[in-house]
């Protein structure tokens, strides 16, 4: 089984790809992560399965949306199923830009025929922590409990709070795990 979880954004999109058998448990080590960043020091490899890459240069918004969607499609192609975090209803700022950006990706996924599951952000947070309004720090704390890995100390040790790309990796992990658990639940029912 190859499935993907996407934490999609304009500033730091992240993809988590799980490759394993239905009988194998979902673990951090069976996942590969890819994220985009504007920060040069994050455009590198971490922990053997996390890949940071720089954004492509762009001159207009649609060019940016296309390059992010193309990058994401390059990562998820070959997946049997994909999950993406839905829109946050409390979003502020460039909500139309976020919607246009995400729409380009959803259209590209639709054209491949790969099933796409859209998961509300509150469902991802509740799945991970038991609280639908968990913040980035709470999500990271739960990730550390579940995996034994402190991404903040490995990737952003100079930051005082959990931020990009750590929060995006954590979110993508739980989006992918949410999809995995749903697939396994349906598999065991049939």
What are these regions (language model features)?
Residues 1-190:
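Phosphate- and other anionic-substrate recognition elements at nucleic-acid/protein interfaces
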